[in-house]
Amino acid sequence: MFAPVKRAPRFLIDTLAALPGVSAAEGRVVGEALIDLPGLELPVRGRALSLPDMDGAYLNGVLLVAGRMPDPGNADEVLLLRSFASARGLRPGDRLTVTMNGSRRSLRIVGLAQSPEFIYITAPGEVVSNDAQYGVLWMGRRAIAAAYGMEGAFNEAILTLDRSARLAEVLDAVD
């Protein structure tokens, strides 16, 4: 279950995880981005998401298919969705100019990834999937939090529910 919010303090994740019917909860930072690519007059729309600070399994995790994970201490390293990278001829080592929250940044692709969330992806407002027209990138949590003014906060919670959960009750409690 995804629960977008404008901004919430990170400590609320523990409160969400303790709700009846919730088996796990994580917070992340999500933001819209514009990706400038050579040869294109207009930037491509995209979505930037935080990676957790921890190693190992996490909710809605990414599968690294090429390269390596971004170094959490290096704010200009990103993972790129493999289908977008393939459609645009991008690979680890390439650089992207990305506008995030009104600021242009030069980012280095260090890996390509897949995610269950983005098996079939359409840009907001679109009906048909086009891998070349919507990019997804992942960054270390501190880097993306700084880019979107979300230090110490999250703007989307991800929850998994146990078998006994009543969806309507969980939704009411999350609200």
Where are these regions (language model features)?
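Membrane transport/envelope proteins' first extracytoplasmic loop
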Residues: 1-175
